[in-house]
């Protein structure tokens, strides 16, 4: 099923997933350019979802990873308004996301930590 990731350099990433799915989001997928931006970790700062089943988010490459969030029905969780994020014990692990229902949409806003390639002549990050 469709997965769309919108990345902003030095800012957040927004992940949109639809339908009955099992998908892995890697840290590299959260980068605007893996040559100049190396994403090392990500935390969930906002969640919007709907499903006729259950959305489950794990840290890792499959369902054996740490379960960090389960969502039923319709949800709007603006964690960033309360200076809270959901990360799990290993913020550097990939996100594995499943939907047990036949339909639904999940939109995640992710705060990310990254390092940037520096221009050796100017000392400024390469854009």
Predicted regions mapped to residue ranges:
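Noncatalytic modules at the cell exterior or secretory-pathway interfaces
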Residues: 83-105
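C-terminal interaction-tip segments
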Residues: 1-10, 99-127
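Short, solvent-exposed S/T- and G/P-enriched segments that are highly enriched in secreted/extracellular
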Residues: 67-83
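Short, surface-exposed beta-strand/strand-loop-strand elements in extracellular ectodomains
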Residues: 52-71
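Hydrophobic beta-strand residues in large extracellular and virion-surface proteins
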Residues: 15-17, 44-47, 55-57, 95-97, ...
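Transition segment at domain starts
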Residues: 1-38
